[in-house]
């Protein structure tokens, strides 16, 4: 079971705690009574799609009866018992024909939305989250993956193994700022960096210690090879070294090195796109990316990037 499902249980227990408080159960009642009453209230909310949707709608703000009628695609008569049930549970308040959440109703609806968002993210991309090593993501951010919103997993087939990176790079070129964490180097990244810098895009790159040491080794005087296993760059060594130093000296590029803790294979965050690639649970490289364009995902991704940047050191030369 993934680590963040432990937080689902914490969220569930948190919800139970609030419900127990709201129903004014006496402290001297035994635990079975508390659990039974709480579970009954959970059933009242989650086993009714109408009541659940009503709570989520009222979370947006008070609504008149006419607004409620227009919001749902079923007869108003069928909504009356659902509203009455929520009023009886002290989750909804009716004042002069206007319905709103009580204080505890707001608390419960907020936590319910949080849980539903998290479950949706997991359910829609279950293979990605269950088959990859999530330990490189700090737990406080892992518990907030519901903020990623609408995501999709990009899976390159063997005949177009580099197409995913190409598609992501095209989106990056349309951005005004770029943040990248790199745990494995590839010649395509070198070429992409040149394009970013030429387009005056502000670029911040975090390299893992091993990647940085690999680049330094290639630039040693006695080195006679650059990316010896792939000849994409077609650069001689002096030219390659010159371009590496150009990257480091450029005003709109900022480089950092991060050692120690485990990192994602690749993290890309811009003002347009969020993309994340992780090792699988066996420590193997996986070329799949989870991608989102939603504002919440961009913010979440930037927080993850800043987490690694905080524990990194700037570099200006090899």
Predicted regions and their residues:
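Basic, Lys/Arg-rich alpha-helical nucleic-acid-recognition elements, primarily the DNA-binding modules
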Residues: 2-120
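Amphipathic coiled-coil/heptad-repeat helices and related helical stalk/stem segments
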Residues: 38, 161-165, 189-190, 240, ...
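Short beta->alpha connector loops
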Residues: 61, 183-187, 261
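Amphipathic alpha-helical dimerization/coiled-coil segments
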Residues: 116-176
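Short, conserved catalytic or adaptor-binding loops enriched in Gly and charged residues
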Residues: 145, 242-250
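Primarily the HKD phosphodiesterase
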Residues: 168-240
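HKD (HxKxxxxD) catalytic microenvironment of the phospholipase D
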Residues: 252-295, 305
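Cysteine/selenocysteine-centered motifs that mediate thiol-based redox chemistry or coordinate metal-sulfur cofactors
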Residues: 302-318
């Amino acid at each position: 079971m993934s680590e963040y499902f432990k937080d689902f249980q914490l969220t569930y227990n948190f919800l139970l705690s609030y419900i127990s408080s709201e129903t004014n159960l006496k402290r001297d009642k035994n635990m079975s009574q508390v659990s039974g009453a709480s579970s009954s209230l959970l059933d009242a909310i989650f086993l009714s799609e109408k009541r659940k949707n009503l709570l989520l709608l009222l979370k947006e703000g008070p609504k008149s009866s006419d607004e409620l009628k227009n919001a749902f695609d079923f007869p108003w008569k069928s909504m009356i018992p659902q509203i009455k049930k929520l009023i009886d549970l002290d989750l909804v308040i009716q004042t002069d024909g206007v319905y709103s959440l009580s204080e505890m109703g707001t608390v419960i609806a907020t936590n319910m939305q949080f849980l539903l968002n998290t479950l949706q993210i997991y359910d829609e991309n279950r293979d990605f989250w269950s088959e990859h090593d999530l330990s490189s993501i700090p737990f406080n951010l892992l518990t907030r993956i519901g903020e990623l919103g609408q995501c999709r997993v990009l899976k390159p087939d063997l005949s177009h193994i580099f197409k995913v990176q190409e598609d992501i790079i095209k989106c990056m070129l349309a951005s005004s700022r770029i943040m990248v964490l790199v745990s494995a180097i590839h010649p395509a990244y070198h070429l992409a960096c040149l394009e970013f810098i030429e387009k005056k895009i502000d670029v911040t790159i975090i390299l893992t210690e091993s990647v940085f040491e690999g680049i330094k080794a290639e630039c040693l005087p006695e080195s006679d090879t650059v990316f010896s296993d792939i000849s994409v760059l077609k650069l001689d060594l002096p030219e390659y070294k010159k371009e590496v130093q150009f990257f480091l000296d450029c005003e709109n590029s900022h480089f950092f090195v991060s050692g120690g803790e485990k990192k994602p294979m690749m993290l890309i965050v811009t003002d347009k796109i969020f993309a994340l690639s992780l090792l699988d649970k066996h420590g193997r490289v996986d070329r799949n990316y989870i991608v989102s364009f939603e504002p919440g995902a961009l913010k979440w991704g930037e927080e993850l990037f800043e987490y690694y940047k905080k524990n990194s050191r700037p570099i200006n030369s090899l």
